[in-house]
Amino acid sequence: MFVDQVSVYVKAGDGGNGLVAYRREKYVPKGGPAGGDGGNGSNVVFKVDEGLNTLMEFRYNRHFKGKRGENGMSKTQHGRNADPLVIPVPPGTTVIDEDTGEVIADLTKHEQEAVIVKGGRGGRGNTRFATPRNPAPDMAENGEPGQERNIKVELKLIADVGLVGFPSVGKSTLLSVVSAAKPKIADYHFTTLSPNLGVVDTQDSRSFVLADLPGLIEGASQGIGLGHQFLRHIERTRVILHVIDMAGTEGRDPYEDYKKINQELSDYDEKLMDRPQIIAANKMDMPNAQENLIQFKNELEDDIPVYEISALTKDGLRDLLFAIADKLETIPKYEKELEETDDTVVYRYQKEEDPFHITRDPDGAFVLYGQRIEKLFKMTDFQHDEAVQRFARQLRGMGVDKALREKGAQDGDVVRLLEYEFEFIE
């Protein structure tokens, strides 16, 4: 089954916890703190594998979770960083954040990688908190939570040439005779339910990748029929091969077919009309084809080459394939509009979120929430009094106490943070 669009949940690994420990060795009085830091959690990485051409990996597994970093150990030994979770994807994969619509990655080259969510930093051990005033701190940090996202993964096949046309004009037959691909062929509409790829080798030892897409019908760009689901795959083809049933076997006018398909491409993306086109006048072995071709050329206003072929009898295919190969030699391979090399770091300004927000529940409890305050809470080890006191100081420094008083909080009021409750004390 061909899968080219799927929603996925990804969660990077949390950082390992720091450790509270002390040196206890003979002849080492006042050994001091010796708790190590936790290891970093694993990143979730998408990596291009050119052997794949579908998102089948995601069909039955739509939740990916990275491993947690190792906890810190005694004798100031740091925990081990977790290995990244590497997920193979086909070339042409685009990753989009479902909540913001931001394009996270556009993967087009073999072995290209992108970090989709970043693993959490390991928590610091008590060695890191030693100061002259507190040489033996009884506190450590929990690991930072790993990032998590709901993402949409889309595949836009990277083929040199894309076959377009109405259903049953002979696209699949053409692909089957010029390549080793074996698409399903039958005498009814929408026999092709998903894209098929084939490698074409010309007689002069040139080659290119040809994509057969489900047939388009009028209104495809608005979601009518099946072809609209796969219009995105045309975006990365370098040449559009427009296959037309020149015999008009279903009673349609070939020139009207040509205009309607181009209109659908234009409605989907106007830039597609700038893509080089070659017209394959198919079924020339059938009655009325020659007369229709003469009429077609008389009405054709565009300066587009027309090649007479019969996919069934294989007539005219040599000249058509040579023309496609010649055209491809003049067109650069697909590149992203905004090319970012591995050496380039793009900094985007992002407005800093407020560290916390306060709302009030119907029962009168005050609710604290916000990315920063929730992160501090999760990284606090509440089993040690010094860590609790540090968390209280952090809240005071952020202005949480003052903000609660301004909201009307009084002694004994309940304050909620995540699934925990606290008592407000003036």
From Swiss-Prot:
Species lineage: Bacteria, Bacillati, Bacillota, Bacilli, Bacillales
Domain Obg: 1-158
The protein's assembly and partners: Monomer.
Gene name as annotated: obg
Residues reported in the UniProt entry to bind GTP: 165-172, 190-194, 212-215, 282-285, 310-312
Domain OCT: 348-426
Cited Gene3D superfamilies: GTP-binding protein OBG, C-terminal domain, GTP1/OBG domain, P-loop containing nucleotide triphosphate hydrolases
Compartment(s) where it occurs, according to its Swiss-Prot or TrEMBL record: Cytoplasm
Species annotation: Oceanobacillus iheyensis (strain DSM 14371 / CIP 107618 / JCM 11309 / KCTC 3954 / HTE831)
Keywords attached to this entry: Cytoplasm, GTP-binding, Hydrolase, Magnesium, Metal-binding, Nucleotide-binding
Ranges for domain OBG-type G: 159-329
Zinc among keywords: no
E.C. designation(s): 3.6.5.-
Protein name from the UniProt record: GTPase Obg
Primary localisation category: cytoplasm
GO MF terms held by the record: GTP binding; GTPase activity; magnesium ion binding
